[in-house]
């Protein structure tokens, strides 16, 4: 079995479990799935796990600060000013290796906005982002494990055909 099939199986099973349990876990399944995809986009593996979680956490914090700061400033276009400042910061933080996955920060801020951009959704969004990344990591490990457990097949063709 190749990796594409084994990852399809593991993601399918884990995503089905996630969606079934999301409400009782107080997580947003769509945010988990976005973060899950970000894990693979970051290059996967342990480094991808670290970079995705770090960038996701900063992104959701930045999203919260953008909305909060715009409310404090209270002038027309305050939201645009806050977005400009924090979009710059999301890119600038990439100079630090652990925060170098820029799409993670942007998608996580967008997830906060998409979930309603209210203080009461912050924990659910942050938890969902972390859970989605961990599910990406687990699905990757399980897919590779399935590939290793597959028994090699013996070809019917003999390598010595001169007999």
Placement of each model-derived feature along the sequence:
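Hydrophobic alpha-helical transmembrane segments in multi-pass integral membrane proteins
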Residues: 64-73, 115-125
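Interhelical loops and loop-helix junctions of multi-pass membrane transporters/channels
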Residues: 1-4, 8, 85, 106-114, ...
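Alpha-helical transmembrane segments and their membrane-interface boundaries
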Residues: 1-44, 117-125, 135-150, 160-163
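Structural signature of hydrophobic alpha-helical transmembrane segments
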Residues: 18-32, 67-84
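Hydrophobic faces of alpha-helical transmembrane segments in multi-pass integral membrane proteins
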Residues: 6-18, 50, 54-66, 81-90, ...
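Canonical alpha-helical transmembrane segments
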Residues: 37-52, 64-68
